Amino acid sequence: AVARFFEATGKLFREGSTQSVAKAITKAVFENEQGQAQRLQTSSSVEHGQMLFKDANLKTPSDVLNAFAKLDSKMVKSHAAELSQLAERAMTEVMLETDSGKKLKALIGDDAVKSLAVRVVKDYGGGVAAAQKNPEVRINQMQAVFDMEVMHLKAAQRHIEGLASTDLNQGVYAEGLPEDAFNKVGVTNNVERAAAWIINASNSKGNDAENITSLLKEYATNGKDLLNMDNLKELHARLVPNVERDYRGPNISGGTLPSSIGGEGMLKQHIEGFLKENPVADKDLGKHLFAGVIGYHGFTDGNGRMGRMLYAIAELRNDSFNPLAMNAENSLHGIK
């Protein structure tokens, strides 16, 4: 292929005009798989668009999206996959610079908002067809999705952080579940009681009682920091193995749950930031962890089990276990 390239360009230099030589070299370099690979490795949609559309006047991601209106059917067909990636890339970059994107970034951080923007654009961006027709319409629709996410995250944050100034040892927060409601066989060991409570409260089928009991025993004494997101992720992976999905999108149909990406970002900031900057009593830590995990819903599955597991571990580390009643649970996590 390289030899044919030099043979062809050599002939053009000998026999062709300067314009035809330049055009042929440009085509040889950029209109092949190697050229495509180069474009896909560029640092931005603008650089990618300039190379693909051969237009140095493209200065912003919006310029790139507007350039799609000029594409002919031949170009769309011959570069379908690359154009799809470019459209999504440009839309993602536009979304990050909107007011909605900036508000979300302030809540969950740069990496999380970028990850969420990529997912939202894949779900709602409309790809090449939308970019050709009217990309502004799709951008506005996706901003509405971001705005809903911000609203849900802020509502959860107000409730969960508000618990730090609440006495969790009185009223509904102190309501316990009657022993016979979850401890069917009458075990007396606190680890086994905690395992029975977790299993009884879970809606998931096939909970592994042996695994839950083993994790409770291990974490009750291993001293691992429960205000560390990596430690929580490790525990969750062992508690809820074989999770089938890796993403839950923003709720736009009337519910209040945030996306899994937004929820994870908020949970990380809550345990590694808020709770460390606003330390709570050891006897209350389990309730705060329970509220944060379930209220922010940062995992795609098993948030209830994880929240109860952390509550139980915190209790066991204090040589006790007081099973929460449903009213107490609902008041702690605040999900409507």
PLM features: what roles do these ranges have?
Residues G10-A24, A28-N32:
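Low-complexity, charge- and small-residue-enriched intrinsically disordered regions
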Residues A1-R4:
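Hydrophobic, membrane-inserting alpha-helical segments
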